[in-house]
Amino acid sequence: MAIEFAPDNIRVNAILPGAVDTPMLRAGLNRGHVGGETIYDRLENLARKTVNGRIGKPEEIAHAIYFLADDTQSSFMTGQALIVDGGATARLSTE
C-alpha cells in the first residue's frame, strides 16, 4: 500500500502494540479463567514478558500514533510497522 499511495503523498504505516492496560485486555484475561490464577497474576505474567517489566499504557500507544501522524516528525517514514511492545518482541528473539 505504501508504494501504491506514495505518488499521492500518502504515507502508510502501522502501529503494532503489545499488551496495553485497557478494558479490552482485562476482559480478555478474564475469559477462560482457570484454577486459582487471578487477573492480576495474568497481568503480572504479561509484564514479565517485556524487557522493562510492565505492560503499556494507552497514552504510550497514542504518542506513537501522534508521531506517525505528525509530518514534521515522520514525513520520510512510510511502509513501516512500528512495534510498541515494551521490548517483548526483542526478548522473544533471544529465547
Positions of the model-derived regions?
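Residues at or immediately flanking beta-strands
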Residues: 9-11, 78
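Conserved SDR Rossmann-fold cofactor-binding beta-strand/turn motif
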Residues: 11-17, 21, 83-85
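Substrate-binding pocket helix/loop in short-chain dehydrogenase/reductase
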Residues: 46
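Short, flexible catalytic-loop segment of classical short-chain dehydrogenase/reductase
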Residues: 17-27, 31-32
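Hydrophobic "lid"/C-terminal helical patch
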Residues: 65, 69
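Short C-terminal tail/terminal secondary-structure segment
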Residues: 72-73, 78-95
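Alpha-helical segment proximal to the catalytic Tyr-Lys
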Residues: 3-7
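A conserved structural motif in NAD(P)-dependent oxidoreductases
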Residues: 35-38, 50-61
